[in-house]
Amino acid sequence: MAVIKMKPTSPGMRGMVKISRDHLHKGEPYAPLLEPQFQHSGRNNNGHITVRHKGGGHKHHYRVVDFKRNKDAIPAKVERIEYDPNRTAHIALICYADGERAYIIAPRGLEVGATILSGSEAPIRVGNTLPIRNIPVGSTIHCIEMQIGKGAQIARSAGTSATLLAREGTYAQVRMRSGEVRKIHIECRATIGEVANEEHSLRRLGKAGVKRWMGIRPTVRGVVMNPVDHPHGGGEGKTGEGRHPVDPWGNLTKGYRTRNNKRTQVMIVSRRKK
C-alpha cells in the first residue's frame, strides 16, 4: 500500500494525501450482501436535530459484514479485498466451501486466494477466528467480542489491534491500543492479526469539501455565537468563554469524564492512557 501526495495544482490539492487503492477490487460489490442505507441527517422522527454536524454526503450501500465468524470448521477462500465507504478498514469477500459468501474485516497480510478458518480447532494464522481460550498469550488480535456470541466490537478500525496479556480462570486480560487493560471472557472470539489499511492515519483531506462528501457539516465555535445559542456566546468584540468550557447545554466538556457504567466497571483492569 502506498501514500500518494497530490501535486499543488489548486489550493484544495495542496497538502492533500491519499491512500493508494490499486490492490483493491475495482468492480462492483457483491450485491446479495448489500443493504440500503437511509440518510437521516441527524434528525429524529419529528425532524428535530438530535446529532449536530451531520447531513449531505455521498450515497452508498451498507456492506453486511460478518462480525460473528461462527461458521466453524468450514474453510473459506478469500476472493477479493474491497473498499468499504462505511468504515476505515478494508473488507474481504470470502467464499466458504459450501458456497456461502460473506464479508469480513480484512486483516493486514491477508492475500487473495488465502484460506481462513473459524472455530476452536483453527490454526494460529492471520485471519483465523478462535475463542480466546485457544489463542496463545502475547498474540496480536482484532475483532474481539465483548459478550459471547454477540459479534466483534473491539479493534475493528483501520490499523488497530489488541494484545492478549494473560488468562486467569474464565477471563483473559487484553490490552487495547489506548493502553486500557480489560477483562474479556475466554469463550469470546477474536481474530488473529491486526486490521489492514494501517496507513489510513496518514491521509490528509486537503479541503473542506471532502468532509462534506463524508456527510459531516461544519462545527461552529460557541464563542462566536450569541448568548441565546451557546453559553460561551456574547460579549463585545472578541472574548473568551469566561467560564469552564461547556457544551451548548451547559455540560462540562474538554477532559471531563462522562463514563458512568457501573455494570462493566469491574471489567476494566487499568484505565486508558490520556
UniProtKB/Swiss-Prot annotation:
Source superkingdom: Bacteria
Single GO term (MF): transferase activity
Gene Ontology CC terms: large ribosomal subunit
Entry-linked InterPro entries: NA-bd_OB-fold, Rib_uL2_dom2, Ribosomal_uL2, Ribosomal_uL2_bac/org-type, Ribosomal_uL2_C, Ribosomal_uL2_CS, Ribosomal_uL2_dom3, Ribosomal_uL2_RNA-bd_dom
Family, per entry: Belongs to the universal ribosomal protein uL2 family.
Function, as annotated: One of the primary rRNA binding proteins. Required for association of the 30S and 50S subunits to form the 70S ribosome, for tRNA binding and peptide bond formation. It has been suggested to have peptidyltransferase activity; this is somewhat controversial. Makes several contacts with the 16S rRNA in the 70S ribosome.
Record note on quaternary structure: Part of the 50S ribosomal subunit. Forms a bridge to the 30S subunit in the 70S ribosome.
Protein's recorded name: Large ribosomal subunit protein uL2
Source organism of the structure: Polaromonas naphthalenivorans (strain CJ2)
Record gene name: rplB
